[in-house]
C-alpha cells in the first residue's frame, strides 16, 4: 500500500467551501474554519426558510384577498365560507391572482359566494 498524502483532497475541499462562502463578510469568506461554519449555518437558514416561504406566501395571498373582498362589502372569512358552500374550488393563490390582475372575474366570484351565503 502506498502512502496517501491529503494535500490534494484537502485543498479541493477547502476551495469548495470557500467558493460557497464567496460574498460573505470578513473572515467568513477567507478563513476555511469560519467559512465552513458560515456555509453550514447558511444551509440551515435556507432549509428553514424554504418551509417559511410557503407560510409567508399564503398569508400574503390572504391579505390580498381580504383587501379585495372588503371592496365588495364582504370579509375574507365570509368569502371563503361562501365559496365552500357554492362548491367553488379556487385556491388562495388563484383568488389572489384574480383579485390583483382580473378584478371583473374576482367580482363574479364574490357574487357567487354572496349568493351561496344568502
Curated annotation (Swiss-Prot):
UniProt key word Ribonucleoprotein: yes
**What is the protein's species of origin?**
Francisella philomiragia subsp. philomiragia (strain ATCC 25017 / CCUG 19701 / FSC 153 / O#319-036)
The answer on whether this UniProt entry bears the keyword Calcium reads: no
Q: Cellular component terms, GO, for this chain's entry? A: ribonucleoprotein complex; ribosome
Q: What does this protein do?
A: Binds directly to 23S ribosomal RNA and is necessary for the in vitro assembly process of the 50S ribosomal subunit. It is not involved in the protein synthesizing functions of that subunit.
Mind listing the GO molecular function terms for this protein?
rRNA binding; structural constituent of ribosome
Describe the family membership recorded for this protein in Swiss-Prot or TrEMBL: Belongs to the bacterial ribosomal protein bL20 family.
Q: According to its UniProt record, what is one Pfam family this protein matches?
A: Ribosomal_L20
Question: Which protein is depicted?
Answer: Large ribosomal subunit protein bL20
GO biological process terms on file: ribosomal large subunit assembly; translation
Q: Where are the transmembrane segments?
A: none
- InterPro entries given for it? Ribosomal_bL20, RIBOSOMAL_L20_CS, Ribosomal_protein_bL20_C
> Which keywords describe this protein according to UniProt?
Ribonucleoprotein, Ribosomal protein, RNA-binding, rRNA-binding
The family database entries (Gene3D superfamilies) matched by this protein are listed as: 6.10.160.10, Ribosomal protein L20 (1.10.1900.20)
Amino acid at each position: 500500500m502506498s502512502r496517501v498524502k491529503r494535500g490534494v483532497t484537502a485543498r479541493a475541499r477547502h476551495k469548495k467551501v470557500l467558493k460557497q462562502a464567496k460574498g460573505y463578510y470578513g473572515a467568513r469568506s477567507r478563513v476555511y474554519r469560519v467559512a465552513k461554519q458560515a456555509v453550514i449555518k447558511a444551509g440551515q437558514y435556507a432549509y428553514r426558510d424554504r418551509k417559511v416561504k410557503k407560510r409567508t406566501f399564503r398569508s400574503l395571498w390572504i391579505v390580498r384577498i381580504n383587501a379585495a373582498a372588503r371592496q365588495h362589502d364582504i370579509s375574507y372569512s365570509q368569502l371563503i365560507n361562501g365559496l365552500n358552500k357554492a362548491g367553488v374550488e379556487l385556491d388562495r393563490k388563484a383568488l389572489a391572482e384574480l383579485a390583483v390582475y382580473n378584478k371583473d372575474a374576482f367580482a363574479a366570484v364574490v357574487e357567487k359566494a354572496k349568493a351561496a351565503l344568502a
